[in-house]
């Protein structure tokens, strides 16, 4: 399994994994990750491992039934945190972020710089054009300089799509 970590900022949070269906789009600029809404069980399971017969009671004393809740699997597994932007603050953030990614590319993959500049400018323009369709997620450390994943729903779909800048991630094999 490969986990993709942020290369910008101080935290280098884990942001996504190839455990989820992912494809490259926009000339290899973006990873599109298919997420799903899943139900997680919030009940506390207490099993001391002693006498199994005595553990099978009708009602566990002292443990409330917490129920379950719906979550997005990528958000839950990668511990992503929803954040918010208005158009102006996102524009400021993305300019600074692109500058950092370009600096990393210039050092590590200079042949990719020109394509990144062109494709990233086109992509950001399209995001700003549909700005209200997106939600924004940071890694668990909420690094303000780090990668912000975009989430949206395709028309008629119930499961969300996450978008990540491929050049802003480092792949780590586990």
From Swiss-Prot:
GO molecular function, one term: calcium ion binding
Keyword vocabulary terms for this entry: Calcium, Cytoplasm
Localization annotation: Cytoplasm
Highest taxon, organism lineage: Eukaryota
GO cellular component: cytoplasm; nucleus
GO biological process: asexual reproduction; cell differentiation; macropinocytosis; negative regulation of autophagy; sorocarp development
Domain TCTP, chain residue ranges per copy: 1-174
Transmembrane is among the record's keywords: no
Protein function: Involved in calcium binding and microtubule stabilization.
Family: Belongs to the TCTP family.
Name of the protein: Translationally-controlled tumor protein homolog 1
Native source species: Dictyostelium discoideum (Social amoeba)
């Amino acid at each position: 399994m490969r986990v993709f970590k942020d290369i910008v900022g101080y935290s280098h949070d884990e942001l996504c994994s190839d455990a989820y269906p992912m494809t490259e789009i926009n000339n290899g600029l973006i990873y599109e990750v298919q997420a799903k809404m899943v139900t997680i069980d919030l009940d506390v399971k207490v099993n001391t491992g002693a006498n199994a017969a005595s553990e099978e009671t009708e009602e566990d004393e002292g443990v409330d039934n917490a129920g379950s809740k719906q979550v997005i699997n990528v958000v839950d597994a990668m511990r992503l945190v929803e954040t918010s932007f208005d158009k102006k603050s996102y524009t400021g953030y993305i300019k600074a972020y692109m500058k950092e990614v370009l600096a990393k590319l210039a050092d590590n993959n200079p042949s990719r710089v020109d394509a990144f500049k062109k494709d990233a400018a086109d992509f950001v323009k399209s995001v700003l054009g549909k700005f209200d369709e997106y939600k924004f997620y940071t890694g668990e450390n909420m690094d303000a300089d780090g990668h912000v994943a975009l989430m949206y729903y395709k028309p008629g779909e119930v499961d969300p799509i996450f978008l990540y800048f491929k050049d802003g991630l480092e792949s780590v094999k586990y």
